[in-house]
C-alpha cells in the first residue's frame, strides 16, 4: 500500500457518512457512521438511551454485526435469550437474528457486509 493510499484511507475514516437520530417516547438512538467507501464492511458508533426499537424487534437480513460496548450497560433481548452487557463486552449479532436493545450505552458496531437501511427490518412479534 502506497503512502497516498494510506493517507486516503485515514481521510475516509475521519469523514462522517451520516448522522441518524431516532427519538421516541422510550428510546433515543444516535448513530455516527463513518464513510469507509467499502461495501463489505462499515463502522458506526451508536448511543442508545432506552429501548430500540420502541416496540417489537429488529433484524438485519444481510448484515452480521460485531458490537463493542464503550460505556455503560444494558441488555440485548434476542428472541430466545436475554443477554446483559457492560462496558468492555463484545456482542455478536448474526444476520437474520431477531433482537432489541434496552439500556443506556454507547456501542461501536462493525457490520459485514456494510449496513444499509433497506435490509434492516422492524418486526412486531
Q: What spans do the regions from the language model cover?
A:
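Short hydrophobic/aromatic-rich beta-strand segments that constitute the beta-sheet cores
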Residues: 76-78, 109-110
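A generic fold-level signal
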Residues: 24, 38-40, 61, 85, ...
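Short acidic-glycine-tyrosine-enriched beta hairpin
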Residues: 79-96
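Short, conserved beta-strand element in jelly-roll/cupin
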Residues: 59-76
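Ligand-binding loop in jelly-roll beta-barrel domains
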Residues: 95-120
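A short, N-terminal "cap"/entry segment at the start of jelly-roll beta-barrel domains
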Residues: 1-50, 54-57, 123-125
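Conserved hydrophobic/aromatic positions in well-ordered beta-strands
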Residues: 44-46, 67, 108
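Short strand-coil-strand connectors
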Residues: 37, 77-81, 104
Amino acid at each position: 500500500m502506497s503512502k497516498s493510499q494510506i493517507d486516503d484511507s485515514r481521510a475516509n475514516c475521519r469523514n462522517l457518512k451520516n448522522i441518524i437520530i431516532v427519538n421516541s417516547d422510550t428510546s433515543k438512538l444516535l448513530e455516527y457512521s463513518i464513510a469507509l467507501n467499502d461495501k463489505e464492511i462499515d463502522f458506526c458508533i451508536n448511543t442508545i438511551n432506552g429501548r430500540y426499537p420502541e416496540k417489537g424487534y429488529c433484524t438485519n437480513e444481510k448484515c452480521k454485526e460485531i458490537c463493542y460496548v464503550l460505556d455503560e450497560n444494558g441488555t440485548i433481548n434476542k428472541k430466545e435469550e436475554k443477554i446483559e452487557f457492560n462496558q468492555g463486552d463484545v456482542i455478536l449479532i448474526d444476520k437474520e437474528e431477531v433482537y432489541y436493545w434496552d439500556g443506556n450505552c454507547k456501542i461501536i458496531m462493525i457490520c459485514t457486509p456494510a449496513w444499509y437501511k433497506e435490509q434492516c427490518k422492524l418486526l412486531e412479534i
